[in-house]
Swiss-Prot record:
<dbReference type="InterPro" id="IPR001907">
    <property type="entry name" value="ClpP"/>
</dbReference>
<comment type="subunit">
    <text>Fourteen ClpP subunits assemble into 2 heptameric rings which stack back to back to give a disk-like structure with a central cavity, resembling the structure of eukaryotic proteasomes.</text>
</comment>
<dbReference type="GO" id="GO:0051117">
    <property type="term" value="F:ATPase binding"/>
</dbReference>
<dbReference type="InterPro" id="IPR023562">
    <property type="entry name" value="ClpP/TepA"/>
</dbReference>
<keyword id="KW-0645">Protease</keyword>
<keyword id="KW-0720">Serine protease</keyword>
<dbReference type="GO" id="GO:0005737">
    <property type="term" value="C:cytoplasm"/>
</dbReference>
<dbReference type="GO" id="GO:0006515">
    <property type="term" value="P:protein quality control for misfolded or incompletely synthesized proteins"/>
</dbReference>
<dbReference type="GO" id="GO:0004252">
    <property type="term" value="F:serine-type endopeptidase activity"/>
</dbReference>
<keyword id="KW-0378">Hydrolase</keyword>
<dbReference type="GO" id="GO:0004176">
    <property type="term" value="F:ATP-dependent peptidase activity"/>
</dbReference>
<feature type="active site">
    <location>
        <position position="123"/>
    </location>
</feature>
<dbReference type="InterPro" id="IPR033135">
    <property type="entry name" value="ClpP_His_AS"/>
</dbReference>
<dbReference type="GO" id="GO:0009368">
    <property type="term" value="C:endopeptidase Clp complex"/>
</dbReference>
<comment type="function">
    <text>Cleaves peptides in various proteins in a process that requires ATP hydrolysis. Has a chymotrypsin-like activity. Plays a major role in the degradation of misfolded proteins.</text>
</comment>
<dbReference type="InterPro" id="IPR029045">
    <property type="entry name" value="ClpP/crotonase-like_dom_sf"/>
</dbReference>
<comment type="similarity">
    <text>Belongs to the peptidase S14 family.</text>
</comment>
Length: 201
């Protein structure tokens, strides 16, 4: 089990201990920093809904360092980001690959950021199915439907032509922060908090 730091906060009622992620959640910061799968997606969705209930008019900040993962789990997070009232700013720290890159570009337009040395990767969904030929055919058709859906979502958020997206996602397509900005996955590259403060003006 990985160690999670604990923060001690002094209050008028005494000391209170938070794990570091819970403390940052108080500041409306959510971390997507692992493989995207059902359990973690449920936790991220719950945090988004909680912060909306706390204040539907205040922005949420999502920090992403993820290699990607399960498409349906990623879409659960993505759909919730679009569903809730607060704007969701996204920031890539380290990497945003596969479904991680969709979450990155699915943030509020103008509020999608990357640190200078982050890596972003897009690609088509993959499937490895076993069983009867008919079942494999069913899963293959579903994978093609998911592929079309993802291409349409990337096209929507990057403002790129669908045909260009389809070509770009045929194989693993790694990008630097600058390349991701040119592609339309992020809006700005930031190296300090001063940069964010300037862009927010």
């Amino acid at each position: 089990m990985s160690y999670v730091p604990v923060v001690i906060e002094q209050t008028s009622r005494g000391e209170r201990a938070y794990d570091i992620y819970s403390r940052l959640l108080k500041e409306r910061i959510i971390f997507v920093c692992s493989t995207v799968e059902d359990h973690m997606a449920n936790l991220i969705v719950a945090q988004l809904l909680f912060l909306e209930a706390e204040n539907p008019k205040k922005d949420i900040y999502m920090y992403i360092n993820s290699p990607g993962g399960v498409v349906t789990a990623g879409l659960a997070i993505y759909d919730t980001m679009q569903f809730i009232k607060p704007k969701v700013a996204t920031l890539c720290i380290g990497q945003a690959c596969s479904m991680g890159s969709l979450l990155l570009c699915g943030g509020e337009h103008g509020m999608r950021y990357s640190l200078p040395h982050s890596r972003i990767m897009i690609h088509q969904p993959s499937g490895g199915y076993k069983g009867q030929a008919t079942d494999i055919e069913i899963h293959a058709r579903e994978t093609l439907k998911i592929k079309r859906l993802l291409n349409e979502l990337y096209s929507k958020h990057t403002k790129q032509e669908l045909k260009y997206i389809e070509k770009s996602m045929e194989r693993d397509n790694f990008m630097s922060s600058e390349e991701a900005k040119k592609f339309g996955l992020v809006d700005n590259i930031i190296s300090s908090r001063d940069t964010i403060a300037f862009l927010a003006q």
